[in-house]
């Protein structure tokens, strides 16, 4: 009988992967401040010597890592409208887009702060840009507030569509503001028509975005990886913190709240197998958290297959499994299979404007995951999230300002956020390029629609101002980022265009921004210590149920709740 990954609740072991390691030569890079770092000796997440070189020298750069996870035959296809998807061979043609680094690649700050996109709204026609901005705000006001009028909103949206209609054909003359306004107009129209899941769940949002061809999604994601630091910034920071935390452990278990395409873990695997001290790579086990039902579980399985194939290709001992959220999207620690002796790590990537994941899970779901991983005795928790203007600092009093301002304020917050993303992508993605259009259509447009829908519902709560305050209030403590991690972030930004900034807002947190706008942050935390069971009074017999202390600092759980349901299934090797 053929058994698929969806039928198996356990891990997918790669017993054929030995512990042989490849030792990279130590190489030093100047970070621009006169200090030289021996990257090879410290086994960084990114092999910077190779990352900065071309493929001709045989180096395993990050682009190669990503491309190795994408099958060529998945990048060609036909969309629902009959148009062919972008072929893998076309992705690097010069006539499609240009990779234009800034004149000063080591710079991570800018001397030209201001509101991006709005600085030059329509490339020579600022009046039209201001009109678009005012009409968008008026449409948002017409959809909410004490004087809302759906008919007025409909009239305004008709006018907006007339003003941006030429952007539908990816007209080279369309400005950044016009293209951005077109997507926000569509998002508002979706609210008016009820085509966006205003009152629906995350699964409905996933279904709404599933019509894009899988090859187009992967292609757009890879292009976004190549042309911007949005994904790499959070991934590299989290991975470096994980490497440092588990450097002495022989078995590592990462529970990933939103694995997406699984790209984050390729660089971690490479770092584990290329330690300069010759220590064999630890066994890595990744458990991906998925939603109950169809599409989410299948996407996780595909990510697991790609990661498993990549691990086998570099000799990384690896196994992969998944656990599902409850129907109300709550995380239950009992669904995670625990093995004695593993260093447990929680990875939580949330709310990214430039990502293929368009769904923002409820704050209650995120909170249940963070508290659940603390209850399991996680050694480290990494959090990557969007950075809102309401969170100027973790200790400020402006946490609820965005929510207090209602839909219009939150709508304008999202408009400013995506205008910064648009502006930052312009240097790497010329407006007229096919790749730029693909990224906008497949990634940014669905994310804008989701952001506007969430703002309309006002569902973000504490998630809008970041999780720092909640985690401190729940007993989590900040884990300071190493100097190495800070330097790695600065080097990463040096590979891209001027205008990107990196800012330290706490000992455990760094923020990626574009000019004056904060966009996303990465932070590292340690969960509160597990409570030690109290001893019963002398002479009193008190049975211990499922919480006996163990040497690893965690606790043993009842077999009924935590183990039996997983061990009935055999492990399968994927070839």
Swiss-Prot record:
> Single GO molecular-function term?
sequence-specific DNA binding
- What PROSITE patterns does the annotation carry? GRAS
Per the record, which residues fall in region PFYRE? 344-450
Ranges spanned by the short sequence motif VHIID, renumbered to the chain:
252-256
Tell me, in a sentence or two, what this protein's role is. Answer: Transcription factor involved in the control of strigolactone biosynthesis in roots through the activation of the beta-carotene isomerase D27, which participates in a pathway leading to biosynthesis of strigolactones.
Q: Which family does it belong to?
A: Belongs to the GRAS family.
Q: What is this protein called?
A: Protein NODULATION SIGNALING PATHWAY 2
- Which organism does this record belong to? Oryza sativa subsp. japonica (Rice)
């Amino acid at each position: 009988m053929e058994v698929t990954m969806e039928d198996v609740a356990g891990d997918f072991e790669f017993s054929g992967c030995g512990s042989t390691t490849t030792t990279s030569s130590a190489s030093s890079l100047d970070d621009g401040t006169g200090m030289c770092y021996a990257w090879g000796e410290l086994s960084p997440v990114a092999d910077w010597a190779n990352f900065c070189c071309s493929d001709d020298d045989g180096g395993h750069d990050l682009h190669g890592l990503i491309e190795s996870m994408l099958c060529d035959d998945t990048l060609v296809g036909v969309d629902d409208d009959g148009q062919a998807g972008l072929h893998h061979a076309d992705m690097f043609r010069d006539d499609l887009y240009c990779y234009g680094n800034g004149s000063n690649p080591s710079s991570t700050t800018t001397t030209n702060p201001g509101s991006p996109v709005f600085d030059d709204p329509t490339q020579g026609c600022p009046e039209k840009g201001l009109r678009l901005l005012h009409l968008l705000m008026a449409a948002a006001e017409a959809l909410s507030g004490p004087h809302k009028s759906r008919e007025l909103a409909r009239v305004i949206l008709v006018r907006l569509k007339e003003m941006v209609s030429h952007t539908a054909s990816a007209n080279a003359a369309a400005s950044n503001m016009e293209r951005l306004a077109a997507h926000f107009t569509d998002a508002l129209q979706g609210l008016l028509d009820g085509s966006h899941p205003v009152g629906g769940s995350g699964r409905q949002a996933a279904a709404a975005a599933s019509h894009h061809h899988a090859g187009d999604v992967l292609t757009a994601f890879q292009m976004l990886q190549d042309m911007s630091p949005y994904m790499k910034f959070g991934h590299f920071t989290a991975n470096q913190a994980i490497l440092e935390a588990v450097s002495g452990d022989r078995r590592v278990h990462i529970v990933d709240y939103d694995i997406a395409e699984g790209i984050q873990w390729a660089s971690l695997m490479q770092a584990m197998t290329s330690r300069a001290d010759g220590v064999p790579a630890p066994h890595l086990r990744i458990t991906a958290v998925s939603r109950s039902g169809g599409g989410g579980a299948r996407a996780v399985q595909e990510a697991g297959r790609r990661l498993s194939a990549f691990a086998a290709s570099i000799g990384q001992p690896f196994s992969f499994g998944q656990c599902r959220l409850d129907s109300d999207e709550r995380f239950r620690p009992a669904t995670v299979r625990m093995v004695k002796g593993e260093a447990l790590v929680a990875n939580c990537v949330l709310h990214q404007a430039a990502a293929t994941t368009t769904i923002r899970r409820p704050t209650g779901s995120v909170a249940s995951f963070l508290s659940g991983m603390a209850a399991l005795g996680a050694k480290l928790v990494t959090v990557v999230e969007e950075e809102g203007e309401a969170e100027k600092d973790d200790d400020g009093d402006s946490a609820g300002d965005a929510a207090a301002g209602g839909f219009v304020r939150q709508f304008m917050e999202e408009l400013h956020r995506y205008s910064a993303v648009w502006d930052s992508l312009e240097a790497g993605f010329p407006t007229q390029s096919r790749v730029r259009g693909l990224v906008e259509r497949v990634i940014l447009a669905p994310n804008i629609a989701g952001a506007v829908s969430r703002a309309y519902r006002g569902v973000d709560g504490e998630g809008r101002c970041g999780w720092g305050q909640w985690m401190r209030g729940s007993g989590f403590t900040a884990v300071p980022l190493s100097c190495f991690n800070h330097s790695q972030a600065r080097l990463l930004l040096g590979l891209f265009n001027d205008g990107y900034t990196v800012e330290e807002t706490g000992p455990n947190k760094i923020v990626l921004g574009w000019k004056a706008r904060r966009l996303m942050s990465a932070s590292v935390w340690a969960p509160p210590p597990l409570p030690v069971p109290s001893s019963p009074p002398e002479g009193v017999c008190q049975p211990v149920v499922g919480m006996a202390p163990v040497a690893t600092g965690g606790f043993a759980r009842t077999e009924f709740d935590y183990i039996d349901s997983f061990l009935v299934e055999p492990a399968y090797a994927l070839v």
